[in-house]
């Protein structure tokens, strides 16, 4: 689960990290009131969305007067911001964060992630802050420094000092960086995070370190332990289909193709998408109904797939191991009868009660294409999608 910048900075402040006092505003009146409370004569206005690249898209701007604040809010509030990290529709802007401008001497980069290979938390730091870290890793990998945290002892101050030396820090900056490093590690573990990023972590003109930006991603599987974080969830930033799928324990990810997919098992779902691509098609989604698929969940899965107007055909690929193919078939028939599916549906059933499932489909008198092989299913789906366009 992603947090907004202002929410992330609130977490940082709770852990004693250096962040400025800012105000999140939902209308112009709140914004004008906020700048009266903020120090300085210039402020930063930041559109709050769950995506990076806001600055390049115009969603972050220095404002120098009440009129500029009013203009910025009028332009962006209630609109959608398209960045390199969003789709073509962009993300809705319901809040804008205002904070004082900082006098920056240098920009650094600091982040923490879970390294899947070592199964440990890894901190990454670079002296090239304020830019895309992927670009730094590709063009100047020697400027990206890594530290792995031993889960038995946790983050140690000496590791923070080592990173500080590599970043070219000196004097009191080294001690301050080490403190920031240790507190971030504590935050990462205690709040069950999967990503934490400060880009940039800046050195101010007074030589103090400061968290100018903040990005936090919480592990969805641990949200039940953190009701305080769960209450920060902003559903307006999420795909409504994915949110609906979550209610039914369906694993759904929207894509940009035109062939809807409903599969049981993540591996089989990925394989199904691959074979669709192999035959020249484009999957519209990843959807895993899971091993405990029921008739009701299959119906809901169909409804979610068909809310995507781009879908021109649906491919159902079920391997009946835990789940019974006849139950899936009944769910498919019920879904089509209830919601009136107008696009071709190609069904491949294999495994437990597959013959019975195919018989149920055949007796339904619906416009279903039942096939035996995955290759044939993919070919039929690709052809059907092309004919429907």
Curated annotation (Swiss-Prot):
Q: How is the cofactor bound?
A: Binds 1 Mg(2+) ion per subunit.
Keyword Ligase belongs to the record: yes
EC number, as in UniProt: 6.2.1.5
Q: InterPro entries in the record, alphabetically?
A: ATP-grasp, ATP-grasp_succ-CoA_synth-type, ATP_grasp_subdomain_1, Succ-CoA_synthase_bsu_CS, SUCC_ACL_C, Succ_CoA_ligase-like_bsu, Succinyl-CoA_synth-like
Q: Name one GO biological process term.
A: succinyl-CoA metabolic process
Q: Where does substrate bind?
A: 264, 321-323
UniProt superkingdom: Bacteria
Domain ATP-grasp, residue spans = 9-244
What does the record give as cofactor?
A: Mg(2+)
Catalytic activity as recorded in UniProt? succinate + ATP + CoA = succinyl-CoA + ADP + phosphate; GTP + succinate + CoA = succinyl-CoA + GDP + phosphate
Task: Please report the name of this protein according to its UniProt entry.
Answer: Succinate--CoA ligase [ADP-forming] subunit beta
């Amino acid at each position: 689960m992603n947090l907004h910048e202002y929410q992330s900075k609130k977490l940082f402040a709770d852990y004693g990290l250096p962040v400025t006092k800012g105000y999140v505003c939902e209308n112009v009146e709140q914004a004008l009131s906020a700048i009266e409370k903020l120090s300085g004569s210039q402020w930063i206005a930041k559109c709050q969305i769950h995506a990076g690249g806001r600055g390049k898209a115009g969603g972050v701007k220095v404002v120098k007067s009440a009129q500029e604040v009013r203009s910025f809010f009028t332009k962006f509030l209630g609109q959608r911001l398209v960045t390199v990290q969003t789709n073509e529709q962009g993300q809705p802007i319901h809040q804008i964060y205002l904070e004082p401008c900082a006098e920056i001497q240098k920009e650094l980069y600091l982040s923490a992630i879970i390294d899947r290979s070592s199964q440990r938390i890894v901190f990454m730091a670079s002296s090239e802050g304020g830019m895309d870290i992927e670009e730094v890793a590709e063009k100047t990998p020697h400027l990206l420094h890594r530290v792995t945290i031993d889960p038995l002892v946790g983050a140690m101050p000496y590791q923070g000092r080592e990173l500080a030396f590599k970043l070219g820090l000196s004097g009191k900056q080294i001690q301050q960086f080490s403190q920031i490093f240790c507190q971030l590690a504590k935050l990462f573990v205690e709040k069950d995070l999967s990503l934490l990023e400060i880009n940039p972590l800046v050195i101010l003109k007074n030589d103090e370190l400061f968290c100018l930006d903040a990005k936090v991603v919480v592990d969805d599987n641990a949200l039940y332990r953190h009701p305080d974080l769960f209450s920060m969830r902003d559903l307006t930033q999420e795909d409504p289909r994915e949110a609906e799928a979550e209610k039914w324990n369906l694993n759904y990810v929207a894509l940009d193709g035109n062939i809807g997919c409903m599969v049981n098992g993540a591996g089989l779902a990925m394989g199904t998408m691959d074979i669709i691509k192999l035959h020249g098609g484009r999957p519209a989604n990843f959807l895993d109904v899971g091993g405990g698929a029921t008739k009701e969940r299959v119906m809901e899965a169909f409804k979610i797939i068909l809310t995507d107007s781009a879908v021109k055909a649906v491919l159902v690929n079920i391997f009946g191991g835990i789940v019974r193919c006849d139950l899936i078939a009944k769910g498919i028939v019920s879904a089509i009868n209830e919601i009136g599916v107008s696009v071709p549906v190609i069904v491949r059933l294999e495994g437990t009660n597959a013959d019975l499932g195919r018989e149920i489909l055949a007796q339904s008198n619906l416009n279903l294409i039942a096939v035996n092989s995955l290759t044939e299913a993919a070919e039929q789906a690709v052809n059907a999608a092309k004919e429907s366009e």
